[in-house]
Amino acid sequence: MAPVKQKKKNKKKPLDKAKKLAKNKEKKRVNAVPLDPEAIDCDWWDTFWLRNSSPSVPSDEDYAFKHFFRASKTTFSYICSLVREDLISRPPSGLINIEGRLLSVEKQVAIALRRLASGDSQVSVGAAFGVGQSTVSQVTWRFIEALEERAKHHLRWPDSDRIEEIKSKFEEMYGLPNCCGAIDTTHIIMTLPAVQASDDWCDQEKNYSMFLQGVFDHEMRFLNMVTGWPGGMTVSKLLKFSGFFKLCENAQILDGNPKTLSQGAQIREYVVGGISYPLLPWLITPHDSDHPSDSMVAFNERHEKVRSVAATAFQQLKGSWRILSKVMWRPDRRKLPSIILVCCLLHNIIIDCGDYLQEDVPLSGHHDSGYADRYCKQTEPLGSELRGCLTEHLLR
């Protein structure tokens, strides 16, 4: 029997590249924008405010908005503009209210900000907005991914003009010449399932935690940050594993113009840090002596005032975004660094937009309550020499 002949399929002519891109773009646009504008939940704020008003919430609308989301309406709109394209172009299924209306970009951003600002459970945040727990989870993570990518320009090492301004302000405010910032660390505490609870993550206070290191300017803006490392390591080791350390050691930053002091000494650029850090040519720690001289005491007082800038910044960060100050319940350790980074970006955005924090927002106590500084013995001669010059300079 002769083999059956198969019919030839008509081959479609391939679309040229330009037409294919245009077709895909149009398809995305159609899928992303609802046909019925009334199906979008645009009056979310009025509904939310009515649902969540209480004696502890300010009666003034603008103050109430900032109370819930840590940002003014103007700053909130700017944040929405950063992530709008991402939130529209990749809408997951199920992003609807209990009433059945689609979530607007503004409401998605509000849900994410409220989750980060309050640190409340996804169930509680969902109830406050009239959405389910899974919606809060999806919305928050999509917002984090989008802002992490779109707000990078709010956290980068300053250019030379800005560095000169920072150095001038630190000297004017605290008397330390050529100082570029203050460095410090804080712990993000979490619980871990038994299978993940290794000693690496168990810190000196027997908590499971992740480190966050920040370098701050005089306005308490992050100039640099690193996170993701276990709280069980020492601060000096965290520093050496950080990109900031490599940049400084390779003279890619903190290598600007030195300043000549009245006694003729040349002072290079540096940051100040506490006793947990090593004394390096570009990282100046306080004098540690059982019998300090008057000049050492005077230097340490100035040094502590600069270092307190970083401590206050962490108080504001953890007070504004309380998800960082509460004990996190079994977080995904791969995602946690992104959550921390986005909170740092939001911290800078609020400052960059000229916004302000309400008085009750910063933590009332220390940002790392219960953690004592562990002394680092490492001392480099050039660092010791620079500290000596600064100490002598403050006596004049």
Swiss-Prot record:
Keywords: Hydrolase, Metal-binding, Nuclease, Nucleus, Transcription, Transcription regulation
Protein localization: Nucleus
Highest rank taxon of the organism: Eukaryota
Motif interval(s): Nuclear localization signal: 6-13
Job of this protein: Transposase-derived protein that may have nuclease activity. Antagonist of polycomb-group (PcG) protein-mediated chromatin silencing, probably by preventing the association of POLYCOMB REPRESSIVE COMPLEX 2 (PRC2) with its accessory components. Needed for full reactivation of several floral homeotic genes that are repressed by PcG.
Organism: Arabidopsis thaliana
Disruption phenotype: Suppression of PcG defects in several PRC1 and PRC2 components including lhp1 (in alp1-2 and alp1-3 mutants) and clf (in alp1-3 and alp1-4 mutants) phenotypes. In alp1-4, weak downward curling and slightly late flowering in short days. Increases synergistically ult1 and ult2 floral organ defects in double mutants alp1-3 ult1 and alp1-3 ult2. The double mutant alp1-3 efs has a stronger dwarf, branched phenotype than efs single mutant.
Cofactor section: a divalent metal cation
Disordered: annotated span: 1-29
Name of the molecule in the record: Protein ANTAGONIST OF LIKE HETEROCHROMATIN PROTEIN 1
GO biological process: epigenetic regulation of gene expression
Tissue specificity remark: Expressed in roots, inflorescence stems, seedlings, leaves, flower buds, inflorescences, and siliques.
EC number of the protein: 3.1.-.-
Domain DDE Tnp4, residue spans: 183-348
Family: Belongs to the HARBI1 family.
